[in-house]
């Protein structure tokens, strides 16, 4: 505990990026404890819980009358999956609350750039899909399916190693997304969000070459806003803490589909 407090005392500044602090904190905890995947059981249970809700979410997506309707509903389901997060004060979820959130996702949509994202997707040929958490990745399959139905080549990226409850290759297999995507790669590292000076050459090549990028979760929202983006990124996440909610100018516990830059 002393080492963690010492780290926070050193790194916690007004300009600090929360995702960067999270990466350093969790790496330190793993090193001290000797446990490189403390969320392993929670991730497995999250995948199992999400898989039980997948058919329900898919039915809602398929209720969309047009391709654009189904795309938007799939975006909403993917955002709702982002609710499956641990260790955030005041943020809780159950299977019942998730089912309700899936059904009422549009009511909580505070930033809606899905129309712009759809138009970009229609013109694109290749997409990089940056996943966030285990459990959540199950719902991501619905959006990957819709992108594939639009004729896009979809490459899914998971983390290169355990960091909090972020999805890894093991979760890509468990969720079924590996069967839907054209290819699954890793970032080559285990950072919260995206830290470009740590990623692998393979990931960086894909990141620089695709036409469009979808990025899930607050970690990517926190880190991508630190870069001068050169191509369109669609951020899909739930505002589960006040700093992120305030940055995007919305209330807490709202759904966000934000096109950047």
Spans of features found by a protein language model:
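Electropositive, gly/pro-rich neighborhoods at or near active sites that engage anionic ligands
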Residues: 1-124
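Histidine-anchored nucleotide/phosphate-binding helix
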Residues: 134-156
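C-terminal functional extensions of proteins
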Residues: 158-160, 164, 168, 173-261
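Short, hydrophobic/aromatic alpha-helical segments in well-folded domains
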Residues: 116-120, 130, 139-143, 202, ...
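Residues at the starts of beta-strands that form the adenosine-phosphate
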Residues: 125-126, 152-156, 232
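A short secondary-structure junction signal
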Residues: 132, 138-143, 167-169, 225-227
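Structural motif
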Residues: 126-128, 211-212
